[in-house]
Amino acid sequence: MANLPPIIISTLDRDRLYALLEHHQEDPEVVKHLYDELDRAECRPLKEMPDNVVTLHRWAYFKNQDNGREHRLMLVMPTDVGEGPDRLSILSPVGAALLGLSVGASIDWPSKGKVLRLTLINVA
């Protein structure tokens, strides 16, 4: 994937994800991309994270540029998906793509044989 936008990940999220990925082999493509994202990310302590960046347990408002649909989802660990509506696992292709993005950034992300183009609209 060329021209990837810069991403910022909290050290807390980074540590949680490394621990998760060590034991997850169900979707090797997503796991590989998450490792790549963690390797290229700027990591900061949680208290230094900008408000406009997607982290775990924050609402991400984004647009799928392929179909024009807007979505609001909370990025969570796989074990937290059932805790409420609109929860999105970090191990899903869209969840992996959104992690660390800043408002206004777009990313092309492989998913099930095609490429999704997502643009982050807001974070809450």
Question: Where are the regions that the model predicts?
Answer:
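N-terminal intrinsically disordered, low-complexity, charge/repeat-rich segments that act as generic
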Residues: 1-53
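N-terminal beta-hairpin/loop module of FHA
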Residues: 33-36, 73, 79
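Short, structured beta-strand/loop micro-motifs enriched in basic residues and often containing a Trp
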Residues: 42, 82-93
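Histidine- and aromatic-rich ligand-binding microenvironments
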Residues: 47, 93, 114
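FKBP-type peptidyl-prolyl cis-trans isomerase
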Residues: 54-65, 70, 74-76, 103-124
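A short acidic, glycine/proline-enriched capping/turn motif at secondary-structure boundaries
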Residues: 67, 79-82, 95
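Beta-rich strand-turn-strand
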Residues: 94-106
